[in-house]
Regions:
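Intrinsically disordered, glycine/charged-rich C-terminal tails and inter-domain linkers
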Residues: 1-12, 140-141, 147-253
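Catalytic NTP-binding/metal-coordinating core of nucleotidyl cyclase/transferase enzymes
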Residues: 2-81, 85
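Short, acidic Gly/Pro/Ser/Thr-rich loop/turn segments
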Residues: 24, 104-106, 194-196
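Juxtamembrane/interface motifs at transmembrane-helix termini
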Residues: 46, 56, 96-98, 204-206
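Polar/charged alpha-helical tracts
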Residues: 53, 115-117, 225, 229
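Catalytic beta-strand-to-alpha-helix segment of the class III nucleotidyl cyclase homology domain
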Residues: 66-191
């Protein structure tokens, strides 16, 4: 085998996005195939619309979707729109989203394979595994990023009008992924503190380090949070002052 790329192959950096409907099998069993097919159809149509809006390309689909974007900013913009749509339309299910940035081999399928029902494009590379593992531990209201995707976001994310200005991000932990040699730092991006909490282990992802709980940073605190912050600390300081005053009297024999 030659190391040279074939004419139908190209290697480039892309944002790989994987989504997955949480509990899809249980949903079908509970509601029946007819109702499930209607919901999944509405869901898939929305996903395709958001992929087009953010200049992405669908690679594969089943219970979830595999897609690629030219930039991480486009991928995150897609994720925010997608998650918002699921919430606002009150879908009876939620989904996971994982985003990874990597150099991938993009393979264009031959015409006869496409005519037979095959995919037009395939992605090859370990990056697809990392994206899948990242997605697998995502909470139902979360958007998770790999380390490389997070760095791309921090570098270029401010340029995107589709990423909310109030978006917050946090390192949620270090995970060891099955089939991936090096541990992966995973980040969450969201609008509220609850969306930035560390996800638990998954079948193919084990958490090996990181904070147990993510707390809001000073610049992200809301007004009522600042009030509570000052009351709590003011009360603690007052307690120390009172203790300082009465401590000598407690041990004064007179």
């Amino acid at each position: 085998m030659s190391n040279e790329l074939s004419k139908n192959m190209v290697e480039q950096y892309i944002a790989i996005v994987l989504t997955d409907i949480i509990g899809s099998t249980r949903f079908v069993q509970k509601n029946g195939s007819h109702i499930a097919a209607q919901w999944f159809g509405i869901h898939d149509k929305a996903v395709m619309n958001f992929i087009a809006r953010h200049n992405g390309q669908l690679i594969d689909a089943s219970d979830g979707h595999l897609m690629m974007f030219a930039t991480v900013s486009d991928a995150i913009g897609f994720a925010f729109d997608y998650k918002k749509y699921i919430r606002k339309r009150k879908f009876p299910f939620r989904s996971r989203v994982g985003i990874h940035w990597d150099k991938m081999l993009i393979v264009k399928s031959e015409a006869h394979m496409v005519r037979a029902g095959g995919k037009r494009i395939n992605l090859e590379g370990i990056g697809k595994n990392i994206a899948a593992r990242t997605m697998s531990i995502c909470g139902e209201e979360q958007i998770l990023l790999s380390k490389s995707a997070y760095f791309q976001y921090k570098k270029y994310g401010h340029r995107s009008r589709f990423i909310p200005n109030k978006a917050q991000s946090a390192l949620v932990g270090l995970y060891r992924f099955k089939g991936v040699a090096e541990p992966e730092a995973i980040y969450a991006i969201g609008l509220i503190e609850a969306q930035l909490q560390p996800p638990p282990d998954g079948e193919k992802a084990k958490r090996i380090g990181g904070a147990k709980k993510i707390r809001s940073r000073a610049r992200d605190r809301k007004f009522w949070e600042w009030i509570w912050w000052f009351i709590w600390r003011g009360g603690f300081v007052s307690f120390l002052m009172i203790l300082y005053i009465i401590w000598p009297a407690m041990f004064d024999p007179n």
